[in-house]
């Protein structure tokens, strides 16, 4: 993790706790979840990961982005995760697609479940102020989520120099560097697993 941070990169482990196929659902027992699907995420937490992305789909009937048990009880309380959680692409807006809330209430559900950052839907920005004013969301939850997002930015050095990673010379030096590209190809080649050899 320090190696990533020193290069201005954050780590996001995706997608807790199961994949599913977009609008498909994942039905499984707790035994299967804890023995097969959650161990890699727990290992990432134990290794000090800085952020974790919730999955897009339903897990046992609940959108993972709005699953308080999964985010707060398992991830934070049982495993001690103190980093930032981020929704999968537009998944907070999609809570209403699953029929579990109106679109306007989806952000409140996700925030109460422990999802700190809304990726793309804009619902946190557009609806949480009104939800706090109505008393539907405790302002302390907004503060807690904001703190985690700001801590992630602090670790990346964005408060010292917000444009530090927007320098064109970094493209050739860091991103398009031949040694880095070679290493990336080698790492990718080692990830393939032969399932069946005919």
Listing of model-derived features with the role each one plays in the protein:
Residues 1, 7, 11-198:
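Glycoside hydrolase catalytic-domain context in secreted enzymes
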């Amino acid at each position: 993790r320090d190696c990533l941070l020193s290069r201005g990169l954050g780590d996001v482990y995706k997608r807790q706790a199961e994949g599913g196929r977009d609008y498909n659902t994942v039905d499984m027992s707790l035994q299967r979840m804890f023995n097969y699907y959650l161990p890699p995420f727990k290992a990432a937490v134990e290794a000090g990961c800085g952020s974790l992305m919730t999955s897009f789909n339903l897990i046992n009937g609940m959108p993972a982005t709005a699953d308080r048990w999964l985010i707060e009880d398992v991830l934070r309380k049982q495993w001690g995760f103190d980093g930032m959680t981020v929704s999968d692409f537009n998944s907070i807006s999609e809570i209403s697609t699953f029929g579990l809330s109106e679109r306007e209430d989806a952000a409140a559900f996700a925030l109460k479940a422990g999802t700190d950052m809304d990726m793309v839907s804009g619902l946190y920005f557009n609806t949480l102020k009104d939800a706090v004013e109505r008393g539907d969301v405790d302002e302390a939850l907004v503060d807690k989520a904001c703190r985690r997002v700001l801590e992630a930015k602090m670790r990346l050095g964005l408060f010292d120099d917000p444009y530090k990673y927007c320098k064109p010379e970094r493209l050739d030096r860091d991103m398009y560097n031949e040694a880095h590209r070679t290493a990336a190809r080698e790492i990718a080649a080692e990830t393939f697993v032969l399932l069946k050899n005919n």
